[in-house]
């Protein structure tokens, strides 16, 4: 057997007991979850903006970012619901590179999963406390969900995970919205199959237990662009793409049809500055069609304190060490633009 069992890690309950959620933050999450849920059920017309760094690598910078976001939120909260993007696990195309704070709490040092789980929990709690906002993260590892299940208000399933059965089954047990991204091929049927699976009840094995879920009616789609056989980006945020998704939804027995559009990744061709133009086009499409207006519940934007990206070890505070992001000034202006659109 080629596995080396290095050490047993604390269970989610043990980590939660060590770093508990205060009663005040529990109430905050309850209220935020209810408000966000109503967007997906059609009871709330506010527009969702999931915004933040490509990867949350530094607690101080992330907490400064969400503190700034909280100040903007006070001015736009009648029109928008801002959800900080605090991504603590990063899928890597080749398996190499920085995989997030859970793997490496210090990007310049080796893997330390024990300290990584603690760092993830502490950062999410700190960000929630200083901003009054509950966050979004990507569920890269389904078995790790329990470490943050009482903190997150939104979860994304990535393009490389969306076809995986365990991801779909675990999402079916969530009580928060879960966005299922289209795969890198762009196949909408794969994404919609994933949504369908997540909305159903399932029995399965999870963390050594036989479990059964009730299904998640808040599972929905995320359009993030695709890649063709030549490796070129194919965007899927245009009016005709949104119309096609709407038609595909109508062909299926799915509840709460909804879409979030990811303005970066293959929609922008990884040209981060294009996110501003893309978001504006999405808002224009919503104005042109009541059906698209009802389908597109929000956007996802990669943004940090400083624009662009840097190599690990350059130590530029608030600048991404993974994909390039919008800087704060452009982000703030874009958020006010979105509020004016609503």
Stretches found by the model and what they are:
Residues 1-41:
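N- or domain-start disorder-to-order transition segments that initiate the globular core
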Residues 40-43, 70-77, 125-130, 213, ...:
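Acidic (Asp/Glu)-rich catalytic clusters
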Residues 66, 79-244, 265-270, 275-281, ...:
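Active-site-facing alpha/beta catalytic cores
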Residues 304-342:
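Internal helix-turn-beta structural module
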Residues 54-57, 256, 264-270:
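Short acidic, Gly/Ser-rich segments with clustered Asp/Glu that frequently serve as metal-coordination loops
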Residues 52, 261, 327:
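Conserved, mostly hydrophobic/aromatic
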Residues 25-39, 72-83, 89, 120:
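N-terminal beta-rich core of secreted/periplasmic extracellular enzymes
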Residues 48-61, 323:
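Conserved phosphate/anionic-ligand binding catalytic regions in large, soluble enzymes, centered on
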């Amino acid at each position: 057997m080629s596995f080396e069992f290095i050490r047993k890690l604390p269970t989610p309950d043990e980590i939660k007991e060590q770093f508990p959620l205060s009663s005040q933050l529990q109430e905050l999450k309850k209220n935020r979850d209810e408000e966000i849920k109503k967007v997906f059920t059609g009871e709330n017309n506010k527009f969702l903006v999931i915004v933040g760094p490509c990867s949350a690598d530094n607690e101080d910078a992330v907490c400064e970012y969400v503190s700034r976001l909280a100040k903007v939120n006070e001015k736009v909260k009648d029109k928008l619901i801002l959800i900080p993007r605090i991504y603590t696990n990063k899928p890597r195309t080749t398996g190499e590179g920085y995989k997030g704070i859970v793997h490496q709490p210090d990007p310049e040092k080796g893997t330390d999963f024990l300290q990584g789980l603690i760092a993830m929990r502490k950062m999410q709690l700190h960000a929630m406390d200083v901003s009054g906002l509950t966050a979004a993260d990507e569920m890269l590892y389904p078995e790790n969900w329990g470490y943050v299940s009482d903190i997150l208000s939104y979860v994304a399933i990535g393009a490389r995970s969306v076809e995986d059965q365990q991801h779909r089954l675990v999402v079916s047990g969530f009580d928060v919205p879960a966005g299922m991204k289209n795969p890198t091929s762009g196949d909408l049927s794969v994404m919609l199959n994933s949504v369908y699976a997540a909305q159903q009840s399932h029995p399965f094995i999870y963390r050594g237990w036989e479990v059964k879920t009730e299904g998640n009616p808040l599972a929905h789609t995320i359009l993030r662009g695709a890649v063709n056989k030549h490796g070129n980006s194919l965007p899927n945020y245009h009016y005709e793409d949104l119309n096609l998704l709407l038609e595909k939804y109508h062909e299926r027995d799915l509840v709460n049809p909804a879409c979030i559009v990811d303005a970066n990744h293959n929609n922008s061709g990884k040209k981060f500055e294009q996110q501003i133009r893309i978001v504006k086009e999405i808002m224009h499409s919503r104005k042109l069609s009541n059906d698209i207006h009802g389908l597109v519940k929000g956007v996802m934007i990669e943004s940090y304190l400083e624009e662009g990206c840097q190599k690990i070890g350059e130590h530029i505070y608030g600048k991404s060490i993974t994909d390039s992001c919008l800087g704060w000034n452009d982000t703030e202006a874009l958020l006010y633009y979105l509020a004016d659109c609503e």
